[in-house]
Amino acid sequence: MKQYYPLSNTILSEIKKARNILINIHRNPDLDSIGSATALYQALKKMGKKVTLVCPHQIPENFKFLKGADSVKTIDFKEWADTEVRPYDLFLILDSGSYDIVTGHKEIKLPEIKKIVIDHHKTNNLLDVYIRLIDEKASATAEIIYRLFSDWNFNIDKNIATSLFSGIAGDTVFFKYSKNAKSTFKIALNLLELGADKNKLIDQAFDSFDFNLVKMIGETLTKMKKRDGFVYSIIDNKTYEKYGKPKGARELVADFFARSIKGYNFGIIAFEVEKNVFSLSFRSKKDTDVSQIAKKLGGGGHKNAAGATIYGNIDQVINKIKEII
């Protein structure tokens, strides 16, 4: 049977040869990064492989229902010495378009291990790696992992199905923004047939918001302003800390409000996550490509959903955004 990805067998061969495998979950982990990583983690464990999941940030509590998520090691790549890297002979880099997205630091290179990149971001710039599988037509990296499993004739159990379904649902905002709707819905249906627990996903990830998270969303909406063609909201670090820096607030406002306002083509939500460090989320309607705006600011992503990090005070950030737009 013809394989979906010509690189499938090559990737599987490298996995079979490896003795100790590292899988990343990117900074500010979302459902796709966690879902695709935990699905691959479970699969490789079933193959008898020694596997470690790493992330530069803590995994949100409401995503820990995914099997394997409670095994993630939170590491600081700045302090990750050669001695800690040495045991690993393969690094699977998922859903990460740049080094800083992998490490959480702007100027840190990845450790000297054989690397395989699997991603769906067209702006991916991780070029100095052994294998690159970039499918920008996929709605989520979890969708690529699903197709790899199909190419490998790997049997997906209900826990792996839940991880993959969660990744796809998360990156498409529960199928609202799938790139290839027909294909994505077919995959989602198959995962449900294989036992994916949709109800647990909804209960844990979408219907279990912390009170401070909701308050932070309200504050962000209150500060929203409009300009020609777009809306934006900028939250300073003092306000962010006031509500305990709730994870996911920026992304939720971006996904559900920034691109949904009548008469405006796109939105920008910026949080000062540390002193003079702003994380930006861009969301747009169908015909507006915000990945190009993000790219000019050193970030990247998809046509209708992208991100970037800007360094400076709030006035400098506003000026940088105005210069680009």
Where are each of the predicted segments found?
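An acidic intrinsically disordered interaction segment
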Residues: 1-9, 108-115, 136-145
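Hydrophobic helix-and-loop "lid/oligomerization" segment in the mid-to-C-terminal part
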Residues: 2-28, 33-67, 71, 79-90, ...
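Short, motif-level signal for alpha-helix interfacial/capping segments enriched in acidic residues
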Residues: 3-10, 96-98, 148-151
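Glycine-rich, phosphate-binding/catalytic loops in enzymes
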Residues: 39-41, 108-111, 133-134, 186
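Short, hinge-like loop/turn segments at secondary-structure boundaries
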Residues: 68-72, 110, 133-136, 284
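Active-site cofactor/cluster-binding pocket
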Residues: 73-131
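Conserved beta-strand scaffold positions in the cores of enzyme catalytic domains, especially
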Residues: 115-117, 132-133, 230-232, 269
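Short alpha-helices
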Residues: 118-187
